[in-house]
Structures are given as C-alpha cells and as structure tokens.
C-alpha cells in the first residue's frame, strides 16, 4: 500500500498475531518486523518465538525485556493511586498496554518504520489503548488494525487460515480461550465464559488453586513498604518484578486473587473475564493496611478520589496524558509517608493483614484505648459536637419557627 514500506507488528506468537504476519505479507508490499514485549508472560510463550516470527514471514524479530520497567514504572504508580476499575478489576491488562506501546513506538522509530500493526479486535479496549499511545507519542506513524480490515470474523476462521499456511499455533477448536498474561496477572476470556450462566471450569484458572483445594494451614508473609512501594518480602530486599513473582507463587498456592467479573468496556459493550492476580492482591492488602495507619481522613478521601479517576484513565488508555501525570504526582506526594511493615495471612482464597506498624502511624493506643487513659479529656467532645452540628441546629430552629408562622423572609 502506498506510503508504507516497513511495519512493526506487536507480536505475541498467539492466534491473532500468528495470522497477521502472513496477512500483512499478502496485503502490503512492506517489510514486517515482529516486536515482542516481555512483560512477564509465561516463559513457554516466548520459547522459540523469534524463529516462529521469521518462519511466519517477518524479516526480523525484536524481543524487549520490559519486566522491571512494567512493574516499577506502571504497576507501582497505579498501586499508589489505589486504582481499581469498577470496584474489582486490578487493571492487569490495562497497565501493560502503555509500556508495550511505548517500547513498540521506540522500536518503530529506531527501525525507520512507517506504520505499526496490532492484533486487537474491533470490539475490545486494547485497540484504543495501543492507538491512543501511538497518537500521544508518535502521531506520524500509521496504524494497521487487521481485525477491522480483514474478512475473518472468529477464532475458528483464524485457525483455518493458519492451517492452510502450515503455521503452528497452540489454540484449538476444542479449547478456545483468549488469554493475556503478564507479571501482574493472567486473564481468560471466551469459551464457556461467553455465557454468564456458566460457572468457569478449572481449565480456566492457570495461576491459582481452588480455595477448597488450598492448604489447610495458613501461610504468613511479611512485606516492607517504603514510600508506598513494596521493597522487601520477609525482610529480603528484592526488585519490584522479583517481589511480584515471589508473591504470585506463594499466594497462588492459597487460591488468592481470583475474580470472575462482567465489566463495562470503553466501546459500550459488556465483557466477561476471569482474572488471577495473586501477588497483586497481597500487595494491595499491604498498602491499604499502611494507609489505614498513616493517612488522615481527608488525605485518604482524596487518595480514594485519585484512585477512582485513575482507574478510568488507565482502563481507557490515557496513560500518556497531562491528567495522568498530575494524578501520579499527587499520589506520590501522599505516598511519601507510607512506610511500614505488614504481616499478611493467606488462607483458602483470602488474604488478611493481621499485623501492621509504621513509624509515621497516626494511630495512638493511648488515645484509642477503651480503658482508662490520661491523654484524652472526653469533656472536650461537647464543644466539638456543638460546632460540628451548628448548621443542623440552625436549620432545625428555622424550620420550627416557620412551622408556627414565623417570618419567612428574615435571614
């Protein structure tokens, strides 16, 4: 196609992108470069991926290790805001898209590409996230979205397309799931999940065991938090990615972090997905425990507002925006005092903070005790209550006055 000489494809080796390489070769007179982002997905997914991309028709395959950058620069800032989409979704796929798109744009510019391509469907959120990032970072790049162009409409069509071209793929007609994994989570959609009346089979879950099959004894883990970031597990300092992978393994064995939700997509439809975020669920519990100790009431309320707004920004693909930067800056300021240690209990699908302390804690046992104390004069509460309820008292007095025929105009 005129004006396009080199295309960088976001390549996973999965069903969609396995079909896109030959499709691009057949429909565009351009060089195809496969770009693989390692954000902590299953190691099996990366094994032999360069050879597979070349065999599928790519002239080159770039594999970029983004694991530490993903957790440090995208997961941790999101955790500080407290963002949770629609009350349950910890934004695993949403957070990964901007780091992938940014690295992909950098690769496209370095390779002198004219366009990028992705395997996102025309029904999903990811097309908006990828293309929104490109628009913000390199608007001169063209975007090719095969799912919005070709005549294939189902995963079955793609399997047939690949079979005629002798291109291998793990997906089968018997087990058709759409999965997305990174260091933070793994999501599963499709198959029996397309009916909300179907209970997910155990084949859906990859990282976690059923709660009823989890160990009968709880496991405890101690997390150290510094300025709103988890920096150590059981007093052992680790990198952000190492911390997450460690917690994924330990929490997954106890069935922690499973959710089955039906969410509102950006494009207007609802979708159902089963998400597993074992380590992330533990980290969130630890950070909330430290917040409970450190943040005063108005600061915590503000942080909750930040989280609500940020969850939509991340979900909607608006990471590279001024508002996103402003919210992250505000969350970082709040997190400056979020230092502490938390012991969490993992048991039968649940995680609970059972011990917590912070050098910046506003909790005082002397003030909070239900026993005798020497620091709090309870008579002081009377004056506070009179001022706190003053507006209510004035309103009630005026209503009483009006009810007996008093002056309705006097202010």
Curated annotation (Swiss-Prot):
Alphabetical UniProt keywords: Amino-acid biosynthesis, Arginine biosynthesis, ATP-binding, Cytoplasm, Ligase, Nucleotide-binding
Binding, L-citrulline: 89, 94, 125, 129, 178, 187, 263, 275
Any one GO molecular-function label of the UniProt entry: ATP binding
Positions annotated to bind L-aspartate: 121, 125-126
One family name in Pfam for this protein: Arginosuc_syn_C
Annotated compartments: Cytoplasm
Chief location bin: cytoplasm
Domain of life the protein comes from: Bacteria
Keyword Zinc-finger: no
Binding annotation for ATP: 10-18, 37, 119
Enzyme Commission number(s) from the entry: 6.3.4.5
Name of protein: Argininosuccinate synthase
Organism, scientific name: Aeromonas hydrophila subsp. hydrophila (strain ATCC 7966 / DSM 30187 / BCRC 13018 / CCUG 14551 / JCM 1027 / KCTC 2358 / NCIMB 9240 / NCTC 8049)
Gene name for this UniProt entry: argG
């Amino acid at each position: 196609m005129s004006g396009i000489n080199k295309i960088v494809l976001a390549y996973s080796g999965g069903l969609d992108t396995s079909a896109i390489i030959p499709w691009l070769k057949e429909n565009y007179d351009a060089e195809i470069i496969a770009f693989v982002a390692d954000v902590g997905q299953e190691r099996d997914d990366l094994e032999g991926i360069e050879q597979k991309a070349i065999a599928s028709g790519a002239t080159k395959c770039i594999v970029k290790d983004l694991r530490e950058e993903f957790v440090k620069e995208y997961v941790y800032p999101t955790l500080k805001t407290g963002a949770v989409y629609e009350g349950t979704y910890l934004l695993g796929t949403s957070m990964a898209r901007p780091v992938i798109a940014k690295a992909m744009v950098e690769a496209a510019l370095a390779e002198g590409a004219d366009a990028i391509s992705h395997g996102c469907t025309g029904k999903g959120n990811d097309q908006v996230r990828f293309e929104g990032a490109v628009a913000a970072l390199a608007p001169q790049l063209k975007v090719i979205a095969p799912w919005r162009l070709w005549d294939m409409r189902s995963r079955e069509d793609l399997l047939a397309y690949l079979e005629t071209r002798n291109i291998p793929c793990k997906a089968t007609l018997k087990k058709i799931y759409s999965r997305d994994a990174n260091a933070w989570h793994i999501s599963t959609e499709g198959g029996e999940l397309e009916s909300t009346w179907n209970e997910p089979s155990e084949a859906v879950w990859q990282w976690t065991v059923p709660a009823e099959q989890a160990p009968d004894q709880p496991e405890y883990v101690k997390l150290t938090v510094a300025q709103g970031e988890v920096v150590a597990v059981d007093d052992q300092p680790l990198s952000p990615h190492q911390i997450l992978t460690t917690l994924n393994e330990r929490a997954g064995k106890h069935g922690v972090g499973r959710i089955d939700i039906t969410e509102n997509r950006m494009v207007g439809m609802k979708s159902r997905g089963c998400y597993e975020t074992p380590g992330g669920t533990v980290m969130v519990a630890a950070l909330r425990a430290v917040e409970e100790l450190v943040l005063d009431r108005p600061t915590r309320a503000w942080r909750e507002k930040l989280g609500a707004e940020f969850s939509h920004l991340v979900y909607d693909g608006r990471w590279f925006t001024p508002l996103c930067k402003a919210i992250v800056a505000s969350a970082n300021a709040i997190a400056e005092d979020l230092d502490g240690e938390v012991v969490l209990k993992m048991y039968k699908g649940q995680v609970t903070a059972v011990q917590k302390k912070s050098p910046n804690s506003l909790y005082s046992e002397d003030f909070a005790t239900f026993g005798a104390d020497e620091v709090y004069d309870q008579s002081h509460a009377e004056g506070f209550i009179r001022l706190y309820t003053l507006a209510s008292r004035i309103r009630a007095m005026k209503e009483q006055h009006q009810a007996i025929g008093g002056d309705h105009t006097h202010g």
